[in-house]
Amino acid sequence: MELEAIVLAGRANDGKLAGESEEPLEANIDIAGRPMVSYILDVLERMDQITKIHLIGPREGLSRYETGKVKILPPGGDLFDNVKRGLDAVSSEYALVCASDVPLITSEIMERFLSRCVESGADFCYPVCEKSQCDKAFPGVKRTYLTIREGTFTGGNLFFVRKAAVSQAWPMVEKMISYRKSPLKMAAQLGPWLLLKVALKRASVSELERRVERLIHLKPKALLGADPEIGVDVDKPSDLELCRRILGK
C-alpha cells in the first residue's frame, strides 16, 4: 500500500526543553550530532510505500529538510489545525501521522507498525505499548499508563488513518488527540459505565474499540504490544538525555 506521511514539527522550543537548547524549534534540537526531526524523516524517506512527506512547521526553521519527497507545509494555530492541514494536503487514501520527537523509531519498527495497520483493515490505528516492555527497554522512564483487562499500557506517538473516515469523525478524533497523553480522560469520552470499568481495571480493548466505533462511526484498532520505542517522545529533559545516550553510542 502506498500512502503519504505527515510529520508535526512546528512546536516552538519555549517549554520544558528550552533550557537544553537555544534552537527556536524543538524539532531541531541536537541529538547525537543531528537535529531530532532528521531521525524520523530519514526513516520515512527510506520507505518505498511512503510517497510523500508533509513536514508541518515554519519554513525558516525547516527548509533544510525539503527534498523531492519532503514538502514543507506552513503550520496552523495549534496541533489540531496542523493535523487537519496535513490531512487536507494528503492525496492518498490512508495517511501516517507522526510526531517529530521520536528519534528511536527505526525503519524496522515503522515497517512492523504499518504492516499491522494494513492487516487490521481499520480506519484508525493507534499503537499501544506494554508497560513491562517499556520498563525493560527503558528502565526508569516515566510515562502515563492505563491498566485494562489485557494489561498496563501507554500510547504511542504516531497513528494511521483513512482520510475520509477521520474527516467525517473529526470532532471526536480531535478530543482523542488532545487526550493522547491522558488515557483516563480518553476513556472518559466513552461513557460513565465504560469509564467505571476502566477505573476498576475491568474494561477490555474490544469493549473500548466497539464503543469508539459506535460513537464516531469508524473502525478503530488499538495495536497492542507495539515496539516500546514508539512510546518514547522527547518532551522533557530526561527524555532528551535518554535519547542522546542511546543514539550517541
Positions of PLM-derived features:
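Conserved active-site beta-strand element of glycosyltransferases/polysaccharide synthases
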Residues: K221-L224, D233
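Short, conserved phosphate/pyrophosphate- and ester-handling motifs at nucleotide-, phospho-/glycolipid
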Residues: K236
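Conserved core of the sugar-phosphate nucleotidyltransferase
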Residues: S107-R214, G225-E229
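Short beta-strand-to-loop acidic/aromatic patch adjacent to the donor-nucleotide binding site
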Residues: E93-P103
